Each structure stands twice: as structure tokens, then as C-alpha cells.
């Protein structure tokens, strides 16, 4: 599997061979589905909550006598059919998160990388190590790579780089991805995946031995 390699300025240098251990794994749609579903579930706060009739304040007194009024019998003003009453079968706080095995996560990551490579959506760039905040420079890099206005760009770099992270944060279509904390959502939900050389080497160590 081949990919285009670019300089720090975004100029095309050559075409390189991508590591087969990372980009030629068998596609596992089921693994991608389970990994994405788990990540989506883990993002949910689960803070939704309604009050049942036992939680609503008031309503302890019977509103009127059982007999003799001519009206329907009522036991509480907080019954569900009353205005201001409790909710029946409403949502309660809950934890939606769940875990998937590390083996499944590895398989999902490799499947996504392989799918991206087949679609020619993987680009390799020389290591980016800015010494100052400069959004304009990175906007120019993506423009030179002909990626501007092509959709979301996933920029996969090694570790945390504050200058780099905050510089690209001002570009709406660029998603900063730390190679030490890769999520399937980050590498899947983009049009192009730009990987630095250092990040590629680190991924090879982390995911290359897994199948």
C-alpha cells in the first residue's frame, strides 16, 4: 500500500510504501462497529432524570374526601395525571459506558487504517515541531497539500505538542489526534488522515505486532 509523503511545508516529496502491519489488515466491520459504539456510549453523560410521584414534593394530603363530593376519587395531587405530578417510566440517571477488549480495539484501529489506505486517504508528512503558535503556517501547509476545503482532516501526531495543538485548533476542519490516545472515532470520521513520521513509527510499535 502506497501513500504520498510531504515536507514540513506541504510540498510533495515522493510516494512511499506504508507498513503492511498497519495498513493491510483484513477489514473487520464488526470490530469497527463495536469499538465506535463503545466510544459513543462512553461519551454520554447519562444525567437525564425525571421525578416520579414519590420524588415530587407535596401531595401527601388527600385532596378531597373519598365520597360525597361527586368528583372522581383522588389520593394525591402528585399522581401522574395531575399537572405538577410525577412522571411515569421517565428516564433516570444511568451509566452508559462499557468496555471492549484491547484485542478488539486493536483490530478496529487496523481495519480503519487499512480502509483509509485503500481509499488513498492517508498522507505522510515530515515531523511537525513548531516553536510558536502559528495557525496561518499550518493553514498554508494543508493548502499546499491540496487538502483545504476537502472535508475534515485528521492530523495524527506523536504525543502532545501545545504549539501544534493550539495552532491547528483554530482551523475548523482539522482534528488534532494524539498517537498515544488514538480513538476509532478520530481516525474514522475524517476525509483525509495526515500522519507524521514519528507518529507512524510509534503506531508501528503499538499496533504492528497486533492482528
UniProtKB/Swiss-Prot annotation:
Residue segments, region Disordered: 46-89
One GO term (biological process): translation
Where are stretches of biased composition, namely Polar residues? 46-55
Q: Which domain of life is it from?
A: Bacteria
Quaternary state and partners of this protein? Part of the 50S ribosomal subunit.
Q: Relate the protein's function as given in its record.
A: One of the primary rRNA binding proteins, this protein initially binds near the 5'-end of the 23S rRNA. It is important during the early stages of 50S assembly. It makes multiple contacts with different domains of the 23S rRNA in the assembled 50S subunit and ribosome. Forms part of the polypeptide exit tunnel.
PANTHER family listed in its UniProt record: 50S RIBOSOMAL PROTEIN L4, LARGE RIBOSOMAL SUBUNIT PROTEIN UL4M
Protein name, UniProt field: Large ribosomal subunit protein uL4
Q: Which organism is it from?
A: Leptospira interrogans serogroup Icterohaemorrhagiae serovar Lai (strain 56601)
